[in-house]
Amino acid sequence: MLLKNILSVLAFALLIDAAPVKRSPGFVTLDFNVKRSLVDPDDPTVESKRSPLFLDLDPTKIPVDDTGRNDGVDKRGPVAVKLDNEIITYSADITVGSNNQKLSVIVDTGSSDLWIPDSKAICIPKWRGDRGDFCKNNGSYSPAASSTSKNLNTRFEIKYADGSYAKGNLYQDTVGIGGASVKNQLFANVWSTSAHKGILGIGFQANEATRTPYDNLPISLKKQGIIAKNAYSLFLNSPEASSGQIIFGGIDKAKYSGSLVELPITSDRTLSVGLRSVNVMGRNVNVNAGVLLDSGTTISYFTPSIARSIIYALGGQVHFDSAGNKAYVADCKTSGTVDFQFDKNLKISVPASEFLYQLYYTNGKPYPKCEIRVRESEDNILGDNFMRSAYIVYDLDDKKISMAQVKYTSESNIVAIN
């Protein structure tokens, strides 16, 4: 998902929604409830599970849519969060304030600020179906109800590339996540937004939307001794699975095959690494550029020439809707793999089916072709349709990202990142 803050910083998002279920000496865990809803798959802020996309079009045309603690001497350890498999977002429950006000927020690896809607926030409709207090349907924050709330009297504003935004003031209060309690955490209490949920940004401090840098939540987790390092690992699980997991300060060694390969982060602001090439069922496409690993983006984006090469290698054909909008479609039964070659001979293989999305007419019948979920952009972005095939460790302290081919399993072997 593409976002921009008011300082024109490019950001991207991963989403998470959860409730703490247990706490042990080794780990803090969050379990998530799967919800189903039907929304526009191009809305990066709406909770959009794996529901079918229904199309209002002429039958002959196609549209364009769119964790815990270690028992050893060091008491710091990983904080594990179980993720819902949603078509757009992964969302998680947090608590805010002395009275533990519960909110569901987007956990965003691309942005770096936590913001939540005020209980009196004005919700500005942007997407079809936005009605009433939609921006507060996933919880809101009442500063007056918390004895530990502090208004810093500093304005906050962030704007996303899709045009949605959030405006408010900076506050400090206690934030709870996965059973861990973070004291005096700085965040924005938003009084006007067109987004459907608050966002918990966990990216680089340099990507914060504030003029003055501050300790965002991952940094606070480390400084307050909850985790040993500002790092987290991500397991989105298979397309059919109902949940995945993010672990703050830890790695689940059962969730990948072979060894993790370390790659340097190539940007001072975004979580990007170098990608050499993409091999589409035997046809090689050179990239040789940085690519953002963005769990908050459902599909993948490349600069135009690279995107078109990948699309055509997948058998893409151009179709137009009645308004003249262009879409690339292909046979839904296309098989094989799309192999991503990174530095250090790291290869991540992705089923071709991950890049094909079934379309439906408004009468519920499937369209005979699938949309290719690769699009043209100014930026190279690998979204969820790539990331489900990789186990990814983001180390913000050492500015590196480690990856391996994912292993879909219910087994677990979580160790702390020290």
From Swiss-Prot:
Catalytic activity: Preferential cleavage at the carboxyl of hydrophobic amino acids, but fails to cleave 15-Leu-|-Tyr-16, 16-Tyr-|-Leu-17 and 24-Phe-|-Phe-25 of insulin B chain. Activates trypsinogen, and degrades keratin
Alphabetical list of SUPFAM superfamilies matching this protein: Acid proteases
Residues bound to Zn(2+): 268
GO BP, sorted A to Z: fungal-type cell wall organization; proteolysis; signal peptide processing; single-species biofilm formation; single-species biofilm formation on inanimate substrate; symbiont-mediated perturbation of host immune response
PROSITE patterns found in the cross-reference section: ASP_PROTEASE, PEPTIDASE_A1
EC number: 3.4.23.24
Protein name: Secreted aspartic protease 6
